[in-house]
Amino acid sequence: MLKIEELEEELKKDEINSLYLFYGEEKFLLENSLKKIKKSFGELINGINYITIDENNVENIISDLETPAFGFEKKLIIAKNTKLFSKDNKKGKSENLALKEKINKYIEQNIEMLRKCVVLIFVEETVEKCSLLQTIEKEGVVCNFEYQKASQIQKRLKAIFDAYGVKIENNMIIYLIECCGTNMQELINESRKLIEYAGKGGIVDKQTIDKLCIKKVESVIFDLTDSLGKKDTREAIDVLRNLILAKEPVQKIMITLYNHFKKLYLTKVALNLKKDVASSLNLKPNQVFLVNKYKMQTQKFSEQELRKIIQQLEDLDYQYKIGLIDLEVGFESILCAYCS
């Protein structure tokens, strides 16, 4: 199993293997690696030296492997979402197993030929243990594109800003991640805006990020909660109204706010019981950086206050569903009641 950074280093050196299996949740980095491999081929002509395969035509993979790349040294075959590595398949279980074994046997018996004339890349959502997986682990490269941890994302973004000669402190990169989330594609899009605005030799600070970047609703909910913690009614209502003016669906705000206070409550309980907060909240690796923010916000609320807000949000949801109250009015009532 190769780490993402190790794979990227190999591709940077133009060291291309003949057999790959890519899978996992971090789609941006996965697609980026595919682009680098495609680029190494130079000209790609569909049907000649470039073949795409999916679940519907996966049975053609052996014939595609055997067909020469006429006029080209090698052929690139990308087999996406074939379901060969999972039990969820359109074909019957026995048919899928037979096809899987047939492909596995072919690769095992012809690996030397494949190394000379083919680059075969399987791209899957998830994988389960099977003989085909074991063969690729033995003869090729398997890479799990897991969500990046905040420290890894921070390092990647810093390298991008440095490459364009734009100065940004590490704490500002962390703030950018807090505002915009951990989706790599979205973060790079926001970083490009900041780089264009600052220019070479320029500096990106908090004011620049606040001015240019689109904050995720989850980030704005942190701001709203901070206002509540300070018992600043006006500021809390302003944050709420700005969310609504930004065309965020009121129901989405409701769900996000409810989930946020539920996480604050669970954080409070975990801290009292001396349990790990990240595991108590079931956070993914790219969300662990939020633990400190949850801890800081829980200091502004008692356990009883958090329970009360959660109950009020549940009551509001019920009253809204039976037509007794408007959600926006209900939100403002809860904010005013707490701050008073």
Locate each region found by the language model:
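Helix-rich C-terminal "collar"/helical-bundle subdomain used as an assembly and partner-interaction module
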Residues: M1-E5, K12-Y23, T67, K74, ...
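Non-catalytic interfacial helical region
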Residues: M1-E8, K12-K13, N17-Y20, K27-D223, ...
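Short helix-to-loop capping/linker segments positioned immediately adjacent to catalytic or ligand/cofactor-binding
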Residues: G165, L224-T225, R241-I244
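Hydrophobic/aromatic-lined pockets within catalytic cores
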Residues: G199, G229, I244
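Short helix-adjacent coil turns
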Residues: K216, L224, L228-E235
